[in-house]
Structure formats: C-alpha cells, structure tokens
Amino acid sequence: KTQAALLEAMEERQVTVAGEVRLFHLPFYVFATQNPIELEGTYPLPEAQLDRFMFNILIDYLSEEDELQVVNQTTTNTSIELKPVFTGDDMIQFARLVRYTPVAEPIARYAVRLVQASRPHQPEAFDFIRQWVSWGAGTRGSQNLILAAKARALLQGRFHVAL
C-alpha cells in the first residue's frame, strides 16, 4: 500500500486515504531515501518504478567535523533559525523557466545517445554495460538529463545549455 501511495503521489500529485482523495499543492517534489543496509524486510521498487525518479544520488558518510556539527545541533535544546532562500512560487517560476531554456539539437542528440548507450542491447553499449546492466535508462532518462542540464545552466547564470 505504501508503494502504491508513493506512485500515486508521484504520477497524479494526489493520494487516496480511506477512500478520500487528497491533492498536493505545487510545488510538489518527491525525495526518497533508500538504505541498502536495511533493505531486507522492505519491498524494493521495480525497475519501471525506479525509472520515475530523476536522480539516484549516492551519499557517503559525513566527515568527523560535519558529523560532530550534526550531533551538536540535534542533541541540545538550542534552536536553529532557518531563513528561506526562495519561495514555493519561486520554485514554480524556475521550473517554468527551465522548460523555456533552449537546447541545441547536437546537445539533445548527445544526451539521447548517452542514455541509449546505457542499454545493453544497443550496439553503442560498452562491454561493461552488456556485462553488468540488465536494463538501461528509459526515455525518461533522456528527458531528465536535458531538464537537469537546463536547470544547471540557469543556476550558473546561462540561458542555454552548453557542453
């Protein structure tokens, strides 16, 4: 039921709880964590569902200083004042601007070829892909690669994607 609710939220921006549909307000993003050490006892997402996530970011353990800072900030009664750096409306406007950011055809073609090379049955796939990868990235991979490149360009102050 949890996975079904997660997928409903991701696809339809709503969840159904006890027969009642609850809509999410924009902006709406899903961030999920997966701890491989504790994976036993959970239900891993099938490849088709993993394909719906834009990024899979591997995060290593914190440095001693960073971990000490976390410990100090979370085990005392002092509060940290967080100051917003942007609003939900800012996020919505940025996401719209990403869609309007141009990408030259050779760059889009490069992104598609890169994603296609992740598929073991493709002639362009490297030997290690054929040996170790069961399924490569789907079309969403190409789409998300371009969207991420556009967002990165804007964050770097450029209004076009460059290599």
Go through each PLM region and give its residues.
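Basic, amphipathic alpha-helical bundle interface domains used for macromolecular binding and assembly
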Residues: 74-163
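Canonical AAA+ ATPase core
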Residues: 3-5, 10-101, 150-152
